[in-house]
Each structure stands twice: as structure tokens, then as C-alpha cells.
């Protein structure tokens, strides 16, 4: 999905019907005029796990290090990776209130993948008419639909 130079745009979203419940994740990748869509789901999960999984799947789809602009509607993902992660690691995967970090397995995988690329993390408000975010949301819901069909 990557070429020598340039920026890969990744638009990610997670969805859950019930929380916990069946969930899905969706990714729209764009490099220049090339687009690729990815999606999947899990029968019993949470919305936050699906948001993290979407970001992970986006970065896993890239076959070499590159610059990525990753756009999510999840403040949990954006703030987690840009603000909270270093503190969690310093505290042995504990929050500031000394509780275990939820979804540690996914945070560790996302941290590992993000270190391989140069990632700019962007946030957009969900369900606010952002075309690529709406597409990622539709893909996440497709992931759920195929599970429960």
C-alpha cells in the first residue's frame, strides 16, 4: 500500500452494538489516488477495543515505514497515543490513579506499529459529515453486519 515517498492517509473507526457486544472496525487508506478499504469484527468486544483495532489494522496494512496521517473520531485513541501512553509505560502500564490500563494488549501493539512509521494523529468529530470518517464508520458497521447475519 505504500510507495517510496509521500503520505498515506488513514481514516479509522470502530463501532459496537452494545458495549460490550458485537463490534466492528473500518479503515480507509489513501495514497495519492489509490484507495484501499479494510474491515472486520469481533462477536464480543467494546467500542474502544474496536477503535484501537482500526488504527492497528491501518498501520499493519503498510508494507514499509512511511509518513501517515491517521484520522480518528476517537479521543480515546488520539489522546491515548499522544498524551497518556508514555506515562502508562513509565508507571508499568498503570494509569495516573494506579489502575491497570484497559486494553493494554492493543495499546502495546499500536505503540509498536506507530514507532515503525512517522504518524500524525488527527481527530475529527464523528457523525459530523466528514466523508472519509463516514466511510470508515460504514465499514465498521459492515464488519458487525457480517458477524450477526
From Swiss-Prot:
Compartmental location: Cytoplasm
Residue span(s) of domain RNase H type-1: 4-145
A GO CC annotation given for this chain: cytoplasm
Record InterPro entries: RNase_H, RNaseH-like_sf, RNaseH_domain, RNaseH_sf, RNaseHI
Lineage, uppermost ranks: Bacteria, Pseudomonadati, Pseudomonadota, Gammaproteobacteria, Chromatiales
Cofactor(s) needed for function: Mg(2+)
Major localisation: cytoplasm
Record's protein name: Ribonuclease H
Subunit structure: Monomer.
Keyword field: Cytoplasm, Endonuclease, Hydrolase, Magnesium, Metal-binding, Nuclease
NCBIfam families reported in the protein's UniProt record: PRK00203.1 (NF001236)
Catalytic activity: Endonucleolytic cleavage to 5'-phosphomonoester
GO BP term (any one): DNA replication, removal of RNA primer
CDD domains: RNase_HI_prokaryote_like
Pfam families associated with the record: RNase_H
EC number: 3.1.26.4
Function: Endonuclease that specifically degrades the RNA of RNA-DNA hybrids.
Gene Ontology molecular-function annotations: magnesium ion binding; nucleic acid binding; RNA-DNA hybrid ribonuclease activity
Amino acid at each position: 500500500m505504500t510507495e517510496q515517498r509521500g503520505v498515506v492517509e488513514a481514516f479509522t473507526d470502530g463501532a459496537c452494538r452494545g458495549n460490550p457486544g458485537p463490534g466492528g472496525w473500518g479503515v480507509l487508506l489513501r495514497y495519492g489516488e489509490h484507495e484501499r478499504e479494510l474491515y472486520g469484527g469481533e462477536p464480543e468486544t467494546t467500542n474502544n477495543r474496536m477503535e484501537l483495532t482500526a488504527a492497528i489494522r491501518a498501520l499493519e496494512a503498510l508494507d514499509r515505514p512511511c509518513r501517515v496521517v491517521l484520522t480518528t473520531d476517537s479521543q480515546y485513541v488520539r489522546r491515548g497515543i499522544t498524551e497518556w501512553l508514555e506515562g502508562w509505560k513509565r508507571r508499568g502500564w498503570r494509569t495516573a490513579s494506579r489502575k491497570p490500563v484497559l486494553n493494554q494488549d492493543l495499546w502495546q501493539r499500536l505503540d509498536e506499529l506507530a514507532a515503525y512509521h512517522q504518524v500524525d494523529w488527527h481527530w475529527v468529530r464523528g457523525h459530523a459529515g466528514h466523508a472519509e470518517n463516514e466511510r470508515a464508520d460504514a465499514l465498521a458497521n459492515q464488519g458487525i453486519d457480517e458477524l450477526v447475519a
